[in-house]
Amino acid sequence: MAEVPELASEMMAYYSGNEDDLFFEVDGPKQMKCSFQDLDLCPLDGGIQLQISHEHYNKGFRQAVSVVVAMEKLRKMLVPCPQIFQDNDLSTLIPFIFEEEPVFLDTRNNDACVHDAPVRSLHCTLRDAQLKSLVMSGPYELKALHLQGQDLEQQVVFFMSFVQGEESNDKIPVALGLKAKNLYLSCVLKDDKPTLQLESVDPKNYPKKKMEKRFVFNKIEINNKLEFESAQFPNWYISTSQAENMPVFLGGTRGGQDITDFTMQFVSS
């Protein structure tokens, strides 16, 4: 807190001589009333603040006004501001305050974002082109056989999830889990041959948007029939045999003796 020692000669030119007429606004002097009211004043440099004295005694100007000011700014003079600072003036200052830098997005390690994405899914059953249903045979094997009547309750209900993969107009990547079981169909290499298996998973982590490639199948629709191509082994498909009660397997031929065409029936969850 410092007091103005004396009025500068430039300031005296605006002084009315009547002490009761001289008031300053807080954080000013942005505008001085009475003899100063027509002048829009501001500091040449920031940092000067004025405090109002609300008591008008017969005291000199020196005792009526106190100035809050940084010591290094005491020598600064008050000059008329050319115009009021507008919001749009900020646009001219921003390039001097901020330095523009390019931002590079590393897409190699975005698994966390993908895992947090919601997974769209549905429940369904599958039958091959001969209307054979898929049922469990042992803890980790599926077989295809004809079912009728109440036996249809034995067929497996799949939990089909739409996952990340190489999607195109005719291929939709999906994962096939078994409802109410922690099992997913997966494709692995056994004895140098692509093989279909049921793999146990942790239900806390599955299903997820970005499934490991061995779990992903490209769902292909042709003439109202569906094919399921392994994403891990292209041109290998979920297949059934012409014979009854044979295991479901991964086959490398289409349109041959092995059946690769299926129909899907939706099941309420």
UniProtKB/Swiss-Prot annotation:
Domain of life: Eukaryota
Pfam families, alphabetized: IL1, IL1_propep
Gene encoding the protein: IL1B
A single GO molecular function term of this UniProt record: integrin binding
Presence of the UniProt keyword ATP-binding in the record: no
UniProt cross-references to SMART domains, sorted A to Z: IL1
Primary location class: cytoplasm
Name by which UniProt lists this protein: Interleukin-1 beta
PANTHER family listed in its UniProt record: INTERLEUKIN-1 BETA (PTHR10078:SF30), INTERLEUKIN-1 FAMILY MEMBER (PTHR10078)
Gene Ontology process terms (BP): cellular response to lipopolysaccharide; cytokine-mediated signaling pathway; fever generation; immune response; positive regulation of cell division; positive regulation of immature T cell proliferation in thymus; positive regulation of T-helper 1 cell cytokine production; positive regulation of type II interferon production
